[in-house]
């Protein structure tokens, strides 16, 4: 399997072009799911609480919207992010994938798993940027995938999974999460955000980024790029560059 490269002894996922990738389908954006009474148990690896939690946050309007989009493609397989958290293996993405699969009559794929532990849930914005995720498992060439996770913040995990699948011959038609803020829904970086980032960051930082992660700024998510832009505007390019380099060294150690 391809889709990853080794940097300083660490395996990191590559990414693919966004093209016309749609916004993330977010089931619940009103508030966080962390206040749900079953959240801690589900996040720590208990499947029954995870299924109960997912059921409480799904509604017909969202499911109809997702179903309408997915029907544009043949034989779509739902693939959850298998994420390792500090407290255990998070079961919410798997429970969400099972619910989507059963309700929409799709196929479930669990052959691809996270090969590295990123623990992004506990990270700040800079930490999320530099903690890359790699995957392993069989991708079926030509297969259409709907990738799902419990929550989206910057979208890095979903972007990494998309890259792994597509570099191995699959096609990711959409991504969906159970929870997330509405302004996190846009995955594909916009021309205006990319232009602003390149103007503020300069060629040297983008070259460093490419050397570290194997792709340039055009393959960042919209939320990742917006975050870097805000940090540069607030603290200046020198401070942000130093923070990124320090966080990258810590993540690689």
Segments the model singles out, each with a brief description of its role:
Residues 2-32, 162-253:
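PRPP-dependent phosphoribosyltransferase catalytic core
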Residues 143-170, 174-175:
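A contiguous pocket-lining binding segment that forms or flanks enzyme active sites
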């Amino acid at each position: 399997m391809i889709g990853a490269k080794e940097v300083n002894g660490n395996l990191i996922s590559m990414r693919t072009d966004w093209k016309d990738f749609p916004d993330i389908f977010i089931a619940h954006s009103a508030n966080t799911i962390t206040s749900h009474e079953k959240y801690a148990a589900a996040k720590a690896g208990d499947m029954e609480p995870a299924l109960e939690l997912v059921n409480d946050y799904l509604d017909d309007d969202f499911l109809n919207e997702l179903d309408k989009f997915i029907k544009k493609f043949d034989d779509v397989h739902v693939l959850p992010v298998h994420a390792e958290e500090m407290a255990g293996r998070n079961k919410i993405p798997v429970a969400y994938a099972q619910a989507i699969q059963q309700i929409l009559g799709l196929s479930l794929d669990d052959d691809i798993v996270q090969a590295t532990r990123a623990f992004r849930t506990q990270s700040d914005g800079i930490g999320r940027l530099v903690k890359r995720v790699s995957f392993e498992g069989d991708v079926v060439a030509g297969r259409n995938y709907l990738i799902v996770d419990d929550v989206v913040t910057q979208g890095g995990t979903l972007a990494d999974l998309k890259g792994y699948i597509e570099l191995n011959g699959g096609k990711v038609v959409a991504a969906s999460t159970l929870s997330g803020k509405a302004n996190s829904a846009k995955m594909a970086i916009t021309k205006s955000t990319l232009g602003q980032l390149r103007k503020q960051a300069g060629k040297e930082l983008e070259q460093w980024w490419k050397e570290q992660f194997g792709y340039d700024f055009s393959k960042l998510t919209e939320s990742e790029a917006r975050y870097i832009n805000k940090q540069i505007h607030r603290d200046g390019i020198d401070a942000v560059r130093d923070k990124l380099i320090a966080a990258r060294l810590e993540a690689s150690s």
